[in-house]
């Protein structure tokens, strides 16, 4: 049998249409850019194509899991054919210092669970110092965080870039004090 270009094009077109409607779609990942409306509305919309292909598998409550192991239950809000991360979303965003301009990569892991990787405005993955912290998520929306490192280092709730900026300011202050001491010694000698 001879396969012509037209036959090959039709076969490709048909298989492409079938894969878009396949309930076992390989589409498991999506990304979202945090917009001002995301922060203002305190909810984030799941992309329409992901909803079309995977939305029927999602329960009313999903779990977001970060690489550090932080888990948060988020209640979904359905508006027509749209699905939004809603109740619990603003707490998740606050706990991870998510701001406008951040980039989030979601990977669906079955059983209404998503792995979330957060990229900050520097376009680099944000690493949270939670590996020494024990997080207990309960039904009453209270999260208990324990651990020596967390208690001493992170009570101020500063973002990593604020901590780095504070270190730089401290170093500048120390250099200024040393410079003034040197000038005082010169004045006394001279």
From Swiss-Prot:
It is found in: Nucleus. PANTHER family: B3 DOMAIN-CONTAINING, B3 DOMAIN-CONTAINING TRANSCRIPTION FACTOR VRN1. The keyword Transcription regulation applies. Residues 1-25 are annotated as: Disordered. It comes from Arabidopsis thaliana. Its main location: nucleus. Keywords: DNA-binding, Nucleus, Transcription, Transcription regulation. Residues 12-23 have a biased composition (Polar residues). GO terms for cellular component: nucleus. One of its GO terms (molecular function) is DNA binding. This is B3 domain-containing protein At4g01580. SMART domains: B3. Pfam families: B3 (PF02362). Residues 29-122 bind DNA.
């Amino acid at each position: 049998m001879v396969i012509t270009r037209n036959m090959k094009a039709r076969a490709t077109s048909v298989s492409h249409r079938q894969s878009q409607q396949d309930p076992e779609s390989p589409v498991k990942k999506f990304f979202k850019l945090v917009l001002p409306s995301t922060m203002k509305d305190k909810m984030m919309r799941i992309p329409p194509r992901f909803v079309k292909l995977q939305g029927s598998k999602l329960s009313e409550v999903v779990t977001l899991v970060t690489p550090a192991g932080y888990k948060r239950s988020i209640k979904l809000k359905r508006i027509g054919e749209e699905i939004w991360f809603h109740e619990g979303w603003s707490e998740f965003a606050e706990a991870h210092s998510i701001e406008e301009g951040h980039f989030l990569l979601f990977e669906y892991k079955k059983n209404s669970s998503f792995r979330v990787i957060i990229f900050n405005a520097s376009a680099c993955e944000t690493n949270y110092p939670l590996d020494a912290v024990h997080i207990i998520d309960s039904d009453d929306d209270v999260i208990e965080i324990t651990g020596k490192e967390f208690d001493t280092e992170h009570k101020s709730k500063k973002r990593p870039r604020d901590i780095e900026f504070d270190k730089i300011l401290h170093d500048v202050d120390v250099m200024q004090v040393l410079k003034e001491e040197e000038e005082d010694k010169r004045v006394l000698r001279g």
